[in-house]
A protein has these predicted regions:
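Acidic, proline/glycine-rich low-complexity intrinsically disordered segments
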Residues: 2-171
């Protein structure tokens, strides 16, 4: 029994030697395996949390909500490989570039956006970028703030349909 335990520990140690770690002066993003790059999935996309660029910090929940709604809507397209919320939202507020995010997550496309709110007016901008950070598609949606969930669902469906078409046609 001791021999099996020793062999198991030796194998575990050898496997751990191959694991790459982020440098000590650069903490790894939470929920993301720190690595240089992974093989890119075909028809793949990560949805980053949309940025709140209004003067109201309380709008963060709406930004995360619209991002999550879009992610969920994209997941409904079978031909897409959509990176999960935990992995993509780990880059919230980071200064990591799109090319590096794409390489770390193994995706060919990244969707990012912003939300502005002034009074009852809402502007949501979405941008689809390729793995090099080049803009592939963009659209802006202006709405009057009434039913927040209805707005999120409506815009998420529109963005997901357009993004899915762009991602699958570029493969």
């Amino acid at each position: 029994l001791a021999a099996f335990a020793a062999i198991g520990l030796a194998l575990l140690y050898r496997a751990a030697e191959g694991v790459r770690h982020a440098p000590a002066d650069q903490p790894a993003a939470v929920g993301v395996v720190p690595r240089e790059s992974v093989a890119r999935l075909e028809n793949s996309i990560a949805v980053l949390p949309f940025t709140n660029i209004s003067n109201e910090p309380d709008n963060e929940y709406f930004c995360e909500g619209i991002s999550e709604e879009i992610l969920n809507a994209l997941s409904g397209f079978r031909q897409l490989n959509v990176i999960g919320r935990t992995s993509s939202f780990a880059f919230k507020g980071s200064d990591v570039g799109i090319a590096q995010i794409s390489a770390q997550l193994g995706v060919g496309h990244v969707l990012q956006g912003s939300v502005r709110k002034v009074g009852k007016q809402l502007r949501i901008s979405a941008q689809l970028l390729d793995e090099a950070g080049r803009q592939v598609w963009t659209e802006t949606f202006d709405r009057e703030l009434a039913n927040i969930f209805e707005i999120q669902s409506e815009i998420a469906a529109a963005v997901a349909a357009k993004v899915a078409s762009q991602v699958t046609s570029s493969a």
